[in-house]
């Protein structure tokens, strides 16, 4: 990561793992769905896109998330290069710094793309636990808590729709072993609350962070 237009190495972020390298079998594919890293730091054969017809969705942010699985699962071989070869410039207007309902809706659209491509290319059932967790995190968990952090009025109908759409896609998402292992206890508690009552979730979230911010301001505690 870098905050300037240069080749100076800033914070180093790993993308991918050495054990994912080699001919892609079931184990490697599951790992790549779960921990693929960013699509933009990879080099692909042109034929993967040309032969499959896979294209980036237009007019949304997070467009790489929508097709990452579909592209990787078209490949037969993957190699991880443990060198700094991509410099990601972050600025105040970048997607990692900007939270708005529109950005949240873009993230949800990218999540739908994950599911649509899994159905289109026929790998949903093969990798259902991995797709379920990936979709849950991108479409719902990350979007929900990003939306709550953002300023302004919180639309109960928007949050409710988000939760309902997740349940329609994966009714048993909370039983997923990756969800159980990788989502922290506090988030699980609040997600379960939202699934029962959106209004109760929003009130609890606001009260919790009002108290935490007060405590941090006056007592220096997080």
Q: What are the language-model segments listed below?
A:
Residues 59-60, 68, 77-110, 124, ...:
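Nucleotide-sugar-dependent glycosyltransferase catalytic core
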Residues 149-222:
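Membrane-interface aromatic/basic loop that binds lipid-linked glycans or pyrophosphate carriers
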Residues 39, 75, 80-81, 93-97, ...:
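Gram-positive cell-envelope targeting signals
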Residues 1-79, 89-99:
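Donor-binding/catalytic cores of nucleotide-activated saccharide
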Residues 127-134, 156-160:
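Short, charged, amphipathic alpha-helical segments
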Residues 68, 111-114, 139-140:
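Hydrophobic alpha-helical core bundles mediating ligand binding, dimerization, or RNAP-core interactions
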Residues 132-146:
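Amphipathic alpha-helical repeat scaffolds of TPR domains
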Residues 109-130, 168-182, 188:
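C-terminal, non-catalytic tails of nucleotide-sugar-dependent glycosyltransferases
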């Amino acid at each position: 990561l870098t905050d300037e237009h240069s080749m100076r190495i800033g914070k180093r972020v790993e993308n991918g793992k050495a054990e994912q390298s080699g001919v892609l079998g079931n184990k490697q594919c599951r790992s790549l769905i779960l921990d693929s890293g960013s699509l933009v730091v990879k080099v692909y054969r042109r034929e993967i896109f040309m032969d499959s017809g896979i294209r980036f969705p237009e007019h949304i942010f997070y467009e790489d998330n929508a097709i990452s699985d579909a592209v990787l699962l078209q490949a037969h071989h993957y190699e991880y290069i443990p060198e700094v070869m991509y410099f990601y410039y972050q600025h105040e207007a970048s997607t990692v710094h900007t939270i708005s309902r529109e950005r949240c809706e873009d993230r949800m659209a990218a999540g739908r793309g994950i599911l649509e491509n899994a159905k289109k290319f026929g790998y949903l059932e093969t990798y259902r636990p991995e797709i379920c967790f990936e979709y849950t995190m991108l479409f719902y968990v990350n979007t929900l808590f990003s939306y709550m952090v953002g300023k302004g009025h919180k639309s109960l109908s928007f949050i409710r729709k988000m939760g309902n759409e997740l349940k329609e896609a994966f009714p048993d998402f909370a039983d997923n072993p990756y969800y159980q292992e990788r989502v922290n206890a506090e988030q699980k508690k609040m997600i379960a609350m939202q699934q029962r009552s959106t209004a109760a979730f929003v009130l609890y979230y606001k009260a919790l962070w009002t108290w935490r911010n007060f405590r941090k301001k006056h007592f220096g505690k997080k």
